[in-house]
A protein has these predicted regions:
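Helix-terminus loop motifs that line ligand-binding clefts
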Residues: 127-152
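Residue-level detector of alpha-helical secondary structure
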Residues: 75-79, 113, 117, 138
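Low-complexity, Ser/Thr/Pro/Gly-enriched N-terminal "stalk/linker" regions
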Residues: 22-109
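Well-ordered alpha-helical segments within folded domains of soluble proteins
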Residues: 107-120, 129-133
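A generic secondary-structure boundary signal that marks alpha-helix termini
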Residues: 85, 123-124, 141
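Structural helix-adjacent loops and short alpha-helical linkers that scaffold large soluble proteins
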Residues: 65-72, 121-133
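Classical Sec-dependent N-terminal signal peptides that target proteins to the secretory pathway
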Residues: 2-21
């Protein structure tokens, strides 16, 4: 018998000799103390949101009606509009900048990925459509400056 097998066998036997019988009385089901009964929005106040889309707000209301899990509905309400609320800088012109985080080398990829969930709603909201076009135009503008760069 090689050393590895002998070692594994001795560990298994040692563990088996120290095992105690487990009975149902060893387990107590406790009430979940992490349950939140009153879910509050974590979104910025409406006046402090960087971009507001009526189509996105309507989509949030629609999805929340479909979800039966209150916590999941709360998470969707807070997460889905987060990019618009906190990272999109659009001043009505054909130029939109999206804050993408700390990896500047991935701006082209991340700026597109962050606004991608809203593309499906673009035809329902002219302002949203213009903002999305602004992201694309900003990307083209940056690529024209340096086609081999990926961070601007």
């Amino acid at each position: 018998m090689n050393i590895t097998k002998a070692f594994c066998l001795s560990i298994a036997l040692l563990g088996a000799s120290n095992m105690q019988a487990i009975t149902n009385s060893d387990f107590v089901i406790q009430q979940d103390n992490t349950k939140i009964n009153n879910y509050q929005t974590n979104r910025p106040e409406a006046s402090k949101r960087l971009f507001v889309s009526q189509a996105v707000e309507q989509q949030i209301a629609h999805i929340k009606q479909l979800l039966t899990n209150v916590r999941l509905a709360w998470m969707f309400e807070n997460c889905f509009p987060n990019t618009l609320d906190t990272t999109v800088h659009f001043d009505g012109k054909d130029d939109t900048f999206v804050y993408t985080g700390d990896i500047h080398a991935m701006w082209l990829r991340d700026s597109g990925a962050q606004v991608w969930p809203y593309v499906q709603l673009a035809n329902k909201d002219a302002k949203l459509k213009k903002m999305l076009a602004g992201v694309i135009k900003r990307q083209f503008k940056c690529i024209n400056i340096d086609p081999y760069a990926n961070a601007f």
